[in-house]
């Protein structure tokens, strides 16, 4: 169903990643593109799929917002590999956008599953900041706390002890250093899907590495903030982007 907007053009685009046709939902402003926000979805398949309403939360009259579906999801070719080949779907999209809009600021937002997706890719890309929102920061911690997802993780990755190399390959912290783009950690204290331990662990590791970061915790909120808290979160995220661009 077409999405109508006075300020942006919505379209589902298809691009090549490892010779696979991968899809993304994009909203492009009718005015000059000065900022790009790449939204990395959570979930898998229909759960957590990219929706126009989510993209619109980050938009303004000069901001292009796009959310890749990842391979094997929502009409994209290939198989979802959960933090392996799908990482290329992110990096290829970022490079295409940077080539088309070389002067635009680029910010990545990784939500839930997308949190680790961004951590595994952002430091090697032409981005100005990374916002991890209710995001997974450690695959072992995810396996430990989400008993209900262990079967899926064993199918897609393996067992954390028997298939240690597969889990180590999905660890992002070793690749982050003091020169990495600025990171904002957003998390709810009552998040039952991705515990706030992920945020605490990431913040501690970034502190040890001397990496530039901020935290924004809403201790009374869950995985998705309630409407008043959502407004606060989005306001904080946009101001963080503004400050990063100001001090570029």
Where do the language-model regions lie?
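Alpha/beta-hydrolase fold nucleophile elbow
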Residues: 101-112
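N-terminal cap/lid segment of alpha/beta-hydrolase-fold proteins
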Residues: 1-30
